Amino acid sequence: MTLNEAEIGREYIVSDIETDGDEDMKSFLFSLGCYSGETITVVDKKRNLVVAIKDARYNIDPELADAIKI
């Protein structure tokens, strides 16, 4: 399941990051602290997703959310 399919307010564990070889996207997600085994929570869903990773919140687009498997 991808992060786009996640329920708002529920905590998930990242199982994988699948970027189809896009190293820039993978590096960006890692810089946010988003990697396999990390907890992530969807705070809001509108056009983009607001997610909480560790003690920070980030606004990510649907393409990034599709790369995050939970």
Name what the model sees in each region.
Residues 1-70:
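Compact, glycine-rich, soluble single-domain proteins
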